[in-house]
Amino acid sequence: MGVKSFDEGRIKSAEVIQLITLYNLFSRKESRNIIFQGGTALRWFHGNERFSEDLDFVTSLSMTELTGLLNSLAVSIETGIKAQFGPGAFTLRQKDRGREGSVTAFVEYASEGQRGKTMVKLEFERLKAGASPGQEQVILSSAPAVSYFIRTGQVMFPPGRVVNIETVEEIFSDKIRALLERRYLKG
């Protein structure tokens, strides 16, 4: 089993693609029913500096509604990525993980002349009926880590996009629960 290696340039590209994806996802009215969570939410909104490659969400949308939303986002995400990185090959593909109540998608991009591609994984889990995790609404461009990327010209998008994010307490609760339920040791 190989170990993933990330170089600094690939990490920065992945982070820019994460931000473009978040911006476009939360531009849609359906996003009122989506909450951003996990390690990347800690990275962008709660001051954690550790790179996290996945965008994790919980949602009250049906999996059919979510699949339709993801399909409708492809053009706007591609446009944002190409505006940032220039011409290249883009895909937004969904993968059936065989788990009911979950959708996994991949945003992939390779700039012309670039070896390999940059990939960001999106994971959506359906909320249990009546569940309402602790959340807050934050303007994407006001988060310090995001603001830094904007100020330094690493990403460009208009201000004002509101993102629903889990509270830090809720994210840590999820992390502890995942550790307790895990059947294997993760390095």
Protein language model features and the residues they cover:
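Helical scaffold of the NTase/Pol beta-like nucleotidyltransferase catalytic core
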Residues: 1-35
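Catalytic metal-binding acidic patch
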Residues: 39, 46-70
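Conserved catalytic core of two-metal-ion nucleotidyltransferases
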Residues: 78-125, 162, 167-170, 174, ...
